[in-house]
C-alpha cells in the first residue's frame, strides 16, 4: 500500500487539475490503507468498499450535494484508527470544505457570508500545577481573534485563565503528574490524555506550523480533517470519472480557487498527517500534536 501510494503521489503531482483528483484519490486511499494495515495487524483489506458514496442524480447545485460517509469500508477503518467517529453520516460538500483548516482562509474569502470556523492559536504548552500535581495543555489566542465575538464561540473543552496580559486558554480536563511516581506511569497518563485531547487541535503544515482550534457554531462537522479530505477526494474523483463536464463547470465557476486549493494544499496535508500517524513523528516541515 505504501509503495502504491508513493507511485500515485508522484504521478498526481504532474497532472493538470482536470485529471488530478482521480489519481490523487488512489494515492490517499492507499496511504490510508497503509495506516489501517499497520494499526490492524496487517489487515489485507481485501474486497473492502471505499466507505464513501454520493447521489450523482441529485438535483441540488453541485456543492450542495451530499456525500455519504458510510459506517464501513476504508473510510470507517481510517476513522477508527485515529479514534474518529465511524457513524454513517450525510454531509453537504460545501460543509465538508468549510471544516478543513488547511483551506479555511480560502473558504472564508470564497464564501464570505459563512462564519469562519477556525481560531489561530500559539504558545501551545503543557503546564503543571505543582501543588495539585495536575497537568494540562495551555495556549494563547491570536490577538486578532481575542474579541468577544470569537471568544464567545470557543468550545467548552477549554476555559479562560485569569492571565491579564494575554488571552490565554487551557484545556479543562487535567491529568495526574506526580514526580514521585514512576516515569513510565506518568508517561502512560500523558499519552492517554494526549490521545483524548489532540483532536481538539488542528495544524497546517508549513515552514512554520500554524495551529488552530475550531469554533462551536452551526455548521461544524465533528470529523477529522483526514476523514473529510478522504471523502471529498473520493467525491471529486468520481466527478472527474463519471461527469467530467460538471467538473469542468465547477472549475470555471465561482469555486475554482477553492477546488484548486483543496487539490493542492489538502492533498499535501493529508499525506503529511497520514505519515505522522504511521510514524508517530513530525514529518517534513509540518508537525502534529
Model-derived regions: residue spans:
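Terminal alpha-helical segments
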Residues: 1-289
